[in-house]
Amino acid sequence: MVSTDSIRQSIQAGLACERVDVVGDGQHFQAVIVSSAFEGRARVARHQLVYAALGDRMREEIHALSMQTLTPAEFALRQHG
């Protein structure tokens, strides 16, 4: 079974992140990912960066992953907005 910690570690290993929060039940996961690498990128491009960081795990181990991909400024607005 895939753990939330292993998903978080895989994302952090492949993408410079300020914050990665992952919750899930072993098959379906939700993640909030905050990275400066998302600056100036559309949502699809941001998700592609995360998929690249997860590599084969996305096809082989993770059945469903919903993501919120935010820049540090976007995350700060959500926290204080």
Where are these regions (language model features)?
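N-terminal first-folded block
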Residues: 1-27
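A short acidic, often aromatic-flanked loop/helix-cap motif at beta-alpha or helix-coil junctions
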Residues: 28-30, 75-76
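Residue-level signature for short turns and capping positions that connect secondary-structure elements
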Residues: 27, 36-38, 72
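Solvent-exposed beta-strand sheet faces enriched in polar/charged residues
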Residues: 23, 32-34, 68-70
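C-terminal structural segments of small proteins and small subunits
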Residues: 51-81
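A short interface-forming secondary-structure element
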Residues: 33-45
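Histidine-centered active-site/metal-ligand motif
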Residues: 28, 47, 63
